[in-house]
Amino acid sequence: VDGLKRQLAHEKRINWVNPNNIHLTLKFIGDTPNEDIPKIIEEVGLMLKNHKSFTMNFDRTGIFGSRYAPRVLWLGMQNTPQELYDLEEDTLSVFDKLGYLRDRQNFVPHITLGRIKELCEKQYFQKIVGGIEQKSYIKQDVNDIILFQSFLRPEGAVYKILKKFEI
């Protein structure tokens, strides 16, 4: 990621994610009343009793948006573990039961590297991103799931851990 940041340093309108904030989102629930949190924690905890730890291998890059108007640069997996898809589906089922709507988009497991507001040199960006070697960048054992509360700030999102569940 540091090499990519150096190559794209002239692009001042890319907001790079702080390495401490890198995460994979299973379900974004948006504004949530405080009184819903205990029930969410209880239901997610019960659901996670059916899951075991697994490993994710982040070995490919991609963008959301189009080649001509990219919005997000991300790191994903060529072979997503079935355990992650099962975990995501069970998570959605919990939130269905609690009355939360599902996203309209399909689940694309990824970690966001940077959010792109605007590019000065689109062709150069396409060349750099198109030339990124597809190799194992991060191998991550998944031993816990964290329920975060996020706060949007001008400098980026700030995350507060509400509950950490071991699996």
Predicted region positions:
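Histidine-dependent nucleotide/RNA phosphoesterase domain, centered on the 2H-phosphoesterase fold
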Residues: 1-167
